């Protein structure tokens, strides 16, 4: 087993991956017009909605457990379609100067409409009502595309609010922006861990240089990569699933306890 980073909290990673999985239950309940609730130990604070194809749908939530705060972002249910249709175009980031980010991630995070505030506004408005001394830790997390939104969200929080110590644990996240974005992120987000399955294709996207011929856009990952391995190279959905990430993290924990 590869050594985990010194400050990486395996128990917290499992908890945050499990919360990331809850966003899919939240989405399914919305789609099926059914009630949804978090596990009993968590208190729901805010539902985060996305505007997509003229519809509003849940993109995650803010919750708390005791003095711990959590911002949790949902990924996509149509992974193969997203990979096929993605253009990877970059645009200037709307909330940090002189950096470029992927168009779709920026739009998903910052877009609202007449009926619902943008996910960005909902998070920042909520945090404006909270004093950093009111909580022990502020955790930002997400899986897949939710991991990309989490990266945008935490750097926005660090740059534009008084909450300077938020902590990111993401799972199966793609690259989000250019070198300048990654550099700015790494300088102002103090605690950041990107858990990736070495067999998962999504963390390899967008390509570092794309499109393949013109190389118009250049992408770079933010810190710090925490590699794990499960599945194989032939099953995109399995290698990318949040359930697979949870299972492997739990296996690492068990192995760590046995070897201790």
Name what the model sees in each region:
Residues 152-156:
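Active-site signature of alpha/beta-hydrolase-fold catalytic machinery across serine-
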């Amino acid at each position: 087993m590869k050594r985990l980073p010194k400050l990486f909290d395996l128990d917290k990673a499992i908890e945050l991956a499990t919360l990331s999985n809850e966003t899919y239950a939240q989405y399914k309940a919305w789609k099926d017009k059914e009630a949804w609730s978090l596990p009993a130990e968590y208190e729901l604070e805010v539902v985060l909605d996305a505007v997509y194809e003229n519809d509003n749908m849940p993109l995650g939530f803010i919750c708390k457990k005791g003095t711990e705060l959590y911002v949790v972002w949902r990924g996509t249910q149509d992974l193969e379609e997203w990979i096929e249709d993605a253009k990877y175009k970059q645009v200037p980031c709307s909330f940090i100067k002189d950096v470029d980010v992927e168009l779709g991630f920026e739009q998903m995070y910052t877009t609202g409409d007449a009926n619902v505030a943008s996910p960005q506004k909902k998070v920042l408005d909520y945090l404006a009502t909270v004093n950093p001394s009111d909580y022990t830790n502020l955790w930002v997390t997400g899986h897949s595309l939710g991991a990309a939104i989490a990266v945008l969200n935490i750097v926005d929080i660090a740059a534009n609010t008084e909450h300077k110590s938020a902590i990111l644990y993401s799972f199966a996240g793609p690259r989000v922006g250019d070198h300048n974005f990654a550099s700015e992120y790494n300088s102002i987000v103090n605690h950041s861990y990107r858990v990736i399955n070495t067999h998962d294709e999504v963390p390899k996207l967008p390509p570092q240089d794309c499109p393949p011929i013109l190389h118009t856009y250049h992408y770079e990952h933010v810190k710090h990569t925490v590699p794990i391995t499960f599945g194989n190279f032939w099953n995109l959905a399995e290698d990318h699933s949040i359930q697979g990430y949870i299972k492997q993290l739990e296996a690492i924990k068990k192995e760590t306890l046995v070897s201790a």
